[in-house]
């Protein structure tokens, strides 16, 4: 089945919703994707679409995510000839804000290095730096404390991306320490703060 087009037809500016593109990666915190999407949809004026990595799919059921969800296969199924849409470009044009939650250690390293080998990292590599991009690191404490992690987070901040810091708690593996994704309420509040700064959305 051909995926639904990511870019809706033009609508009057007063009906234009603020478009949030959620990226989800292969951290166990991806378990919270259905809750995160649900809470975002509770915010008046938000429209949500999800881009997932293949590994992230291990942690949630697509049936529990009540919005359009794209993965790597969609990029290739939609493009057959030169005139066909390029999904990662269409998505970066469609979105007003990108939220990567969770951002696992693997994808953090890719983004910091400019690697774009799946749909999500291609969207990020093509991202319009005039638009906000929020990221929520999530990984085991031992991975979080590796010196590379601080360097890579700093690189993302240098790009202009905004970190929603991880928190300290008992992790799924049983360890206690930093590395857990920020609470859903914290993430949604940050999105709302960005939304409040964009009272009028320019029609794209």
Curated annotation (Swiss-Prot):
The protein's Enzyme Commission number: 4.1.1.36
What's this protein's function?
Catalyzes the decarboxylation of the cysteine moiety of 4-phosphopantothenoylcysteine to form 4'-phosphopantotheine and this reaction forms part of the biosynthesis of coenzyme A.
Coiled-coil positions: none
Quaternary structure, from the entry: Homotrimer.
Q: Which family does it belong to?
A: Belongs to the HFCD (homooligomeric flavin containing Cys decarboxylase) superfamily.
Top-level taxonomy: Eukaryota, Metazoa, Chordata, Craniata, Vertebrata
| Active site, renumbered | 173 (proton donor)
Enzymatic reactions:
N-[(R)-4-phosphopantothenoyl]-L-cysteine + H(+) = (R)-4'-phosphopantetheine + CO2
Matching entries from Pfam families are given as: Flavoprotein
Q: Which residues form the signal peptide?
A: none
The entry's free-text remark on the cofactor is: Binds 1 FMN per subunit.
**InterPro entries in UniProt:** Flavin_trans-like (IPR036551), Flavoprotein (IPR003382)
Report the pathway entry: Cofactor biosynthesis; coenzyme A biosynthesis; CoA from (R)-pantothenate: step 3/5
Judging by the UniProt lineage, the source's domain of life is Eukaryota
Q: What is this protein called?
A: Phosphopantothenoylcysteine decarboxylase
